[in-house]
Amino acid sequence: AWYGIDSATLESNRKYNMAGEFYDEEGNSLYYKDQIDNYKQDHYQLHWNQNYLGGWTSNFGLHYTYGRGFYENYNVGYDSPDYIDRRWLDNDFYGFIFSVNQRTTKYNSTIGGSYNKYSGEHYGEYLWIDQDSNSENSYSFKEKFYDDYGNKNEFNIYAKIDYYLNDKLSIYGDLQYRNIKYEAGISANSVFTGYVEEGFSRLDKTFSFFNPKFGLFYNLNDSNNIYFSYARAQREPTRTDFANGSPDAEKLNDFELGWKLTLENSSINVNAFYMIYDNQLVLTGQRDINGYEIRRNIGESYRLGIELDSNITLSSKLNLNTNLSISSNKNQDFYSIFDGILKNYGNTDLAYSPSFIANNIIDYSPNEKVIISLRSNYVSEQYFAQTNSPISKLESFFVHDLNFIHKMSIKGLSDDINFKVLVNNLFNSKYVSYGGYYTYDVPTDNQIKTYEGTYYYPQAEINILVGLDFKF
């Protein structure tokens, strides 16, 4: 159900879902009964942890995941025949991880790494095409209209240390090297059907990243400490990013400064951050034909803000947990094409980046067996479009959930049973938490006119979940 709904439908019928909808010969609206997602994974893991003399420990793990499945979709052809298709994934993911650690009174050091390989087939097949609407249609049952593959090999190794200079000051360092190799083959029909962007037929790309981190911690006293850290992080594009364009790696310099207060019945942590990006991969608001969100590189951008996290015990029965974030998230000197003209939009807000987020949990325990929690979440307004187009603004929302847990036991069955009731959206707010923005160009009178549109994912109104957990 990744289609979403437009603004008019949001006002008139927010529960409408067009996935699988089609019309019979009399024009009646029907829904395809097998409009489904069917995906499975099998996980296998082997872990070996060993302790040695001198504070040494080692960890080694092997893993393998086999995933396969499809989504089946009824497609209304409008000017072409209706058809039903399946789009498949069949993939293997396996590798190993390791680490060796030594902890002493002066330092805590670790050397480790991992190797992982993902190998996947991606293909689509037709299950049915409305031959009556186009007698020249030659597709047959389960004929593949694209047949692609994608491989990703990743290796990383790191060394890190926490070193205690004295009882007040400690420093840490973390050096990581990552190597990523992509291989992908794209069939010609993938481009024809819109599965990937035109011009993309094969991917053979290698990335190598060196990511250093360092920081220091200073204990002012038993209750207060401060810290500073710097991290260099680099992230490769995904296969989907390549299928929708020619992206570059994202690079980030992250500076953070924090203070933590710990008292007998409360704790407060304040963290300031300044994140400087080069070629940040950001959401455009659009989705490709398979429903994946499309990302693009932008030039220079940043995120500057402050976070607060607190936990306060008000009494033996009442506890308050709060976290909030205030930030400025900006594109710098942002350019985009509109009406066929390259325009400078200046400094714009990064899409999908609200400037204020707050969460609050009030826990009340009348006795040792019952916990009642009121959870509140506020998210300020944000944009779907990097251009900050007015129609792409998503309004703020404020929602509350009520959670009830009763601990009990049943003799002869279990001594640890939790009866749970969760009331989501307690006050029945009609809100939207996510959506998208798109544009399309229409040539008119020797010029290009750009049209805009939005789609939304309205969230559920008040709903109740009841559960029972047993431990044997």
Predicted segment positions?
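Transmembrane beta-strands of outer-membrane beta-barrel pores
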Residues: 64-68, 104, 115-119, 177-183, ...
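C-terminal beta-signal and adjacent terminal beta-strands/loops
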Residues: 234, 276-278, 320, 328-330, ...
